[in-house]
From Swiss-Prot:
The gene is cheB2. This is Protein-glutamate methylesterase/protein-glutamine glutaminase 2. Contains a C-terminal catalytic domain, and an N-terminal region which modulates catalytic activity. The keyword Phosphoprotein applies. Keywords: Chemotaxis, Cytoplasm, Hydrolase, Phosphoprotein, Plasmid. It is found in: Cytoplasm. NCBIfam families: PRK00742.1, PRK12555.1. The active site is at residues 158, 185, 278. Involved in chemotaxis. Part of a chemotaxis signal transduction system that modulates chemotaxis in response to various stimuli. Catalyzes the demethylation of specific methylglutamate residues introduced into the chemoreceptors (methyl-accepting chemotaxis proteins or MCP) by CheR. Also mediates the irreversible deamidation of specific glutamine residues to glutamic acid. It comes from the Bacteria. Residues 2-119 form the Response regulatory domain. It comes from Cupriavidus metallidurans (strain ATCC 43123 / DSM 2839 / NBRC 102507 / CH34) (Ralstonia metallidurans).
Amino acid sequence: MRIGIVNDSALAVAALRRALALDTTLEIAWIAGDGEEAVRMAATQTPDLILMDLLMPVMDGVEATRRIMAESPCAIVVVTMDLGRNANQVFDAMGHGAIDAVDTPTLTDSDTKLAAGPLLRKIRNIARLLGGRGQAPHPLAAATPTPTAPRLVAIGASAGGPAALATLLGALPADFGAAVVAVQHVDEAFAQGMAEWLDAQCQLPVRLARAGEVPQAGAVVLAGTNDHLRLTSAGRLIYTPDPCDYLYRPSIDVFFESVVEHWRGEAIGVLLTGMGRDGAQGLKAMRERGFQTIAQDQATSAVYGMPKAAATLGAASEILPLQKIAPRLVMTCGGGRR
């Protein structure tokens, strides 16, 4: 895998060099000292993956991510110091198509492998994702409908998802007539910050899903850990490490499939922007169950991977531009009365 490094700190670049040297399958294609240089390098030597810092002179990592994804798209992971303090910039970069984020490893002679572990695990997962390796579908038993259960909107998103979720959820009215559960590919270290970031932009309350709760109409909950979020036979949300071999954690497919198996009311599946195929099989299972399913269109997707996979499978009953998804949900579920 060919990797570009974008960072203005000599110490950070040295740390990244040492971390990448631990895996012989990784090759440093180039190093850029600011976002503007990275945009030029990506255009002439597009790598498989870019490790993008956020705070740099000339052009910061958010704008560089936006430019690269528009002009020379490739996988981008934000790698910067003190991610927690820069959470808003992380979500902005992910909104433009960055896949993930991780702290810059701090390396010493004694703990190089340990410190580099989180970064290398993310890179290996991205390598698998770029190779197209997903999970095989398995037969599902559908739940028996119960008229008292509220309507559920199940949303999945990955690269580009934070901005897409902000647009979609921000357009839902305060009296929206369905429960909303969203699974965004984001490390649990950023989940709480993302929930707060979305809550500030939405009329509906947004928070992390709690184990044991039942989704409630008029509220949005987000998957909040690196375990999978799923529904139980009682219609309650739980976190589970199984299945262990899934590339994506939390997995959209796992949640969508649990909706098919256990949700006793009506449901709508929505698959937004993202790299790879997660959610496509689950959305197909939802459609086969008789649920309404929506995939974001190519023109408005920061990364047209997951929605494209869904469209190819025939998983989406509708393919819509992002700005038309919320009105469609309101039309179906109710809300926005004056």
